[in-house]
């Protein structure tokens, strides 16, 4: 079970730095899963060094983290934003659902590195539980849509 209050407490502390956090998450995703970069049209075919401080990665970082933040702030009552997120990723972006698990796992690691005092063991467990819940609900949407990607 996710401790949504703990997750939101850390999220609030991080929000002022959302672009940098998002950049670090995306760069780590691309480093660990290079094939994932192909799902971001403005970011594909560029080296990590080229991407590091571009306007494109900053914009994508904001988009990704703000969408995730909108879901996190629902404290588990996130069916509407999850449905909307899944719908665009199924029909427009065609991103396989396992990438949500990958990026949220990376997010826990990046947050732990960037906010070590806030991301203690309890907070890491809370985020892992929250992200597991979110990813599970996203996967249900993919299954309902019979995603073949």
From Swiss-Prot:
Matching entries from Pfam families are given as: Globin
N-acetylalanine, modified sites: 2
Instruction: State a GO cellular component annotated for this protein.
Output: sarcoplasm
Q: Where does heme b bind?
A: 89
Q: Where is the Globin domain?
A: 2-143
Any GO BP: removal of superoxide radicals
Tell me where it resides. Cytoplasm, Sarcoplasm
Q: What does this protein do?
A: Monomeric heme protein which primary function is to store oxygen and facilitate its diffusion within muscle tissues. Reversibly binds oxygen through a pentacoordinated heme iron and enables its timely and efficient release as needed during periods of heightened demand. Depending on the oxidative conditions of tissues and cells, and in addition to its ability to bind oxygen, it also has a nitrite reductase activity whereby it regulates the production of bioactive nitric oxide.
Query: What family name appears in the similarity comment?
Result: Belongs to the globin family.
- How does the annotation summarize its subunit structure? Monomeric.
Full protein name: Myoglobin
Organism, by scientific name, is: Galeorhinus galeus
Gene symbol here is: mb
